[in-house]
Amino acid sequence: MNTLRTAMLLAAMTALFMGVGFLIGGSGGMMIALLIAAGTNLFSYWNADKMVLSMNRAVEVDEKNAPEYYAIVQALAKQAGLPMPRTYLIDNPQPNAFATGRNPQNAAVAASTGLLQRLTHEEVAAVMAHELAHVQHRDTLTMTIVATFAGAISMLGNFAFFLGGNRDNNPFGFVGVLAAMIVAPFAAMIVQMAVSRTREYEADRRGAEICGHPLWLASALDKIARGAERIPNPDAERNPAMAHLFIINPLHGERMDNLFSTHPSTDNRIAALQEMAQQMAGGTQAAPRPTPRQAGEQQPSGPWGQAPQAEQPAEPERPKANPWGRNPTGPKGRWS
């Protein structure tokens, strides 16, 4: 099913490329766009993950320079039956994370320093379990290729203004160029939404199964969403086509309930996880807003053998009591 979905998305993006090419240069422009699309498909398959990691200035870490973070990913990968992915750290105060790679054998997960500093051990585990769920479902290939294509289509639409307005072989003239500038990026955004909004719910569900407790992830989503609203991510702002790769939309000030958001509503995702927690516990009453203390009231079935610590005050400027508050050393020095 994932292979079919990937093929359909590639076909849709290729059709967008060809449509823009036709609007710019008629049948000749369409054929050139087809060749560009074919090259982009091949390049995306082999290199899109490297591009995404590079755009976010992610640095690979291991058990020596990020022992706790690496150990979390290692334990969760074992729990999920996955190969150990390459593990990256993004030097950014906004709490966020993403996964990339063409298959589980070539996957990578990345978390920001803001995520490690602001979330508890259990919440970090839940976030990385969510990312590993994307790897397990092979969403990473689809999402990475779509991100690369969306950026390329947006650039092609912008180039249409300069390249297509006065060409004799442009069958629609300036009207066609305007259509290429407006319709192509919008259509690419629609495809991004089709990928991200449905896959996030499924990754939430599977991630909660991997880490053993849905409320850990619910609490993490709440903290990340509040952090993303007020802490900018300059790298994501420069490359908005990557936004749907992250667990929470990283674009500063983005309204999560917007009709055209790349992510489903955070409140809806939290509600789904609360319902899942009730089902796992066999309860019937509505669950309150999740906290790590509540999550620890029953032993998880995942790789974590003890109850989580109490939640810190909401969105502290500097963490007071979590595993990352002991000044762990990363590739660029101490994180806190």
From Swiss-Prot:
Textual note on the cofactor: Binds 1 zinc ion per subunit.
Protein name in UniProt: Protease HtpX homolog
Topology relative to the membrane: Multi-pass membrane protein
Enzyme class of the recorded protein, top EC level: hydrolase
Annotated residues for binding of Zn(2+): H130, H134, E200
Provenance organism: Mesorhizobium japonicum (strain LMG 29417 / CECT 9101 / MAFF 303099) (Mesorhizobium loti (strain MAFF 303099))
UniProt keyword list: Cell inner membrane, Cell membrane, Hydrolase, Membrane, Metal-binding, Metalloprotease, Protease, Transmembrane, Transmembrane helix, Zinc
Family: Belongs to the peptidase M48B family.
Record-linked HAMAP family: Pept_M48_protease_HtpX
Membrane-spanning residues: 7-24, 29-48, 145-165, 171-191
Biased composition (Low complexity): 278-287
EC code: 3.4.24.-
The protein's required cofactors: Zn(2+)
CC per GO annotation: plasma membrane
Principal localisation: membrane
Compartments (UniProt record): Cell inner membrane
A GO term for molecular function: zinc ion binding
InterPro entries in alphabetical order: HtpX_protease, Pept_M48_protease_HtpX, Peptidase_M48
Example GO BP: proteolysis
Lineage: Bacteria, Pseudomonadati, Pseudomonadota, Alphaproteobacteria, Hyphomicrobiales
Catalytic-site annotation from UniProt: E131
Region of interest (Disordered), residue spans: 278-336
